[in-house]
A protein has these predicted regions:
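Short acidic/polar active-site loop segments enriched in Thr and Asp
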Residues: 55, 140, 209, 262, ...
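C-terminal extensions of enzymes
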Residues: 1-19, 27-31, 43, 146-152, ...
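Short, solvent-exposed loop/turn segments at secondary-structure junctions
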Residues: 34, 38, 63-64, 96-97, ...
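A non-catalytic, amphipathic alpha-helix used as a structural packing/dimerization or gating element
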Residues: 129, 133, 137, 160, ...
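Non-catalytic, usually N-terminal nucleic-acid engagement modules in DNA/RNA processing proteins
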Residues: 1-177, 290-293
Length: 393
C-alpha cells in the first residue's frame, strides 16, 4: 500500500516536501526517478543507485513486455527479485512508447494495435492488458494506459486522445486487482489549458492513488510547459502525489517543484551521460571537447560524487573519446548523483524556508549551454525537446 504525507510547504510558491511510503521504501519528495527501461539503468548496478540515495526507480512495461516478457519476470519472482533492486519501482504503462516507438500503431477505444520496434511483430494492448502486464511485473506503483499525442497535433486529435485517456482510466481502475500496487491516473490535453483543466476535473473524482501529468516534454517550448502546469496543478488535490512524466532537465525540476510537482522521471541524466554530456552546478560540459585534454579539475568543484572527488576532466575526456566502457559508466554515475543532490538541495531549501532564494540563485548560476561551444551548442538544442526522452534508458 502507498501513503503520502506532506511535511513542509513553501510560502513563496506551491513547492512542498513530503514522504511517499511504499512497502519497500520511504521516498522523500520532491524526488527524481532514474529510468531503467529494461530493469536497470544502463552501465549501473542497483547498489550504485542505492549509494546515491534513490528510493524509487522507473521501469518500462512496454520494453519489459517485449523482452524478456512479463510472464517470464513473474515466474522469476517479479521485478524486485529479477533485478535485485530492493526499493520501490514505478512502471510506466508503455503508452508513450506504443505511440512513439512502434513502427505502426492503430488506436481505437478498445486499445492500441502496434508493431514492435524490435522485430515488427504485431501486438494489441488494451487498458485491461496494460494493467495485467504491470501487475505481473510486480511494481509498487503502476500507471494507467493513456494516449500520448505528439506536438504539434490538431485540436480534434488532442481532444480525442484526452477523452480516450479518461475512458481508459476508468477501465484501468476496473481491471486493477492488486491493492498493494498503487495505481496512478494520467492527465492529457496537449497545450490546451481548458482541455487540461477539464481532463483533471474528470480524472480526480475517479479515486486514483496518485495523479500524473503526461504529454509534456514532447517538443513544446518551456514557457508552454510551465503555462500548462500553472493551470493543471491547482486542479489536483494536495493530499495525493503529483507526478510530471518524462520531464527532467535541471531547470524544469526546479520550476516543476515550484508549481507543486512531487515526482519526476527522465532518461536525460543517463542518456546524456552515455553521449558525453555532464551536468554541473553552472551548466553542462561536453566532455569530448579538446579543451579538456589537459584539464586537471573535476567536472564540478561543488559536486560530492565519487567521480568528481576522484577523477579529472582530462581522464573522463580520455576514457570517453577512446570509447572505453568505463567512460559511459562514470558519466552516468556523475549525472545521476548530480540529480540526486539537486533534489536534496531543493528539499532542504523548502524545509528551511529558503526555496525562493534557492530558486533565484539556481537560475543565476545554471546556464544550460554555458560550457558548450559553436556547433556543439547548436547540436545540443534538439535534445531538449526530443520526443523520445521517455524511451530506452
Amino acid at each position: 500500500m502507498l501513503s503520502f504525507q506532506i511535511l513542509n510547504t513553501d510560502s513563496s510558491s506551491s513547492a512542498r516536501v513530503g514522504t511517499l511510503t511504499t512497502t519497500r521504501s520511504v521516498v522523500e519528495t520532491p524526488a527524481f526517478m532514474p529510468v531503467g527501461s529494461l530493469g536497470n539503468v544502463r552501465s549501473l548496478e542497483a547498489e550504485d543507485l542505492e549509494k546515491m540515495g534513490y528510493g524509487l526507480m522507473l521501469n518500462n512495461a512496454y520494453h519489459l513486455y517485449l523482452r524478456p516478457g512479463h510472464k517470464v519476470i513473474a515466474e522469476l519472482g517479479g521485478l524486485h527479485a529479477f533485478t535485485t533492486w530492493p526499493a520501490a519501482i514505478l512502471t510506466d504503462s508503455g503508452g508513450f512508447q506504443v505511440f512513439s516507438l512502434a513502427k505502426f500503431c492503430k488506436v481505437t477505444d478498445d486499445g492500441a494495435t502496434f508493431q514492435s520496434h524490435l522485430d515488427g511483430s504485431t501486438h494489441f494492448v488494451s487498458p485491461e492488458r496494460a494493467i495485467e502486464i504491470q501487475e505481473a511485473l510486480g511494481a509498487d506503483i503502476i500507471m494507467a494506459f493513456d494516449q500520448c499525442v505528439a506536438l504539434p497535433s490538431t485540436e480534434d486529435h488532442v481532444r480525442d486522445a484526452a477523452k480516450r485517456t479518461l475512458l481508459w482510466a476508468r477501465r484501468c481502475l476496473n481491471a486493477h486487482r492488486r491493492p498493494e500496487q498503487a495505481l496512478f491516473g494520467i492527465i492529457q490535453g496537449g497545450l490546451n489549458p481548458a482541455l487540461r483543466i477539464e481532463s483533471a476535473r474528470d480524472l480526480v473524482p475517479l479515486g486514483f492513488d496518485g495523479l500524473a501529468i503526461g504529454g509534456l516534454s514532447v517538443g513544446e517550448d518551456k514557457p508552454d510547459m510551465y503555462r500548462i502546469l500553472d493551470v493543471t496543478v491547482p486542479e489536483l488535490p494536495s493530499s495525493k502525489p503529483r507526478y510530471l512524466m518524462g520531464v527532467g532537465m535541471p531547470e524544469d525540476l526546479v520550476e516543476g517543484v515550484a508549481r507543486g510537482i512531487d515526482l519526476f522521471d527522465c532518461v536525460v541524466p543517463s542518456r546524456h551521460g552515455r553521449t558525453g554530456w555532464l551536468f554541473t552546478s553552472t551548466g553542462r560540459v561536453l566532455i569530448k571537447q579538446a579543451r579538456y585534454v589537459r584539464d586537471e579539475t573535476p567536472v564540478d568543484e561543488a559536486c560530492p560524487c565519487p567521480v568528481c572527488t576522484r577523477y579529472s576532466r582530462a581522464y573522463l575526456h580520455h576514457v570517453f573519446t577512446v570509447k572505453e566502457m568505463l567512460g559511459a559508466r562514470l558519466n552516468t554515475i556523475h549525472n545521476l548523483w548530480f540529480f540526486a543532490e539537486l533534489m536534496r538541495q531543493i528539499r532542504r531549501a523548502i524545509r528551511e524556508g529558503s526555496f525562493a532564494s534557492f530558486r533565484g540563485r539556481f537560475h543565476e548560476q545554471y546556464r544550460p549551454y554555458e560550457s558548450i561551444s559553436g556547433g556543439d551548442r547548436d547540436r545540443a538544442e534538439p535534445a531538449e525537446s526530443d520526443k523520445y526522452m521517455r524511451g530506452d534508458a
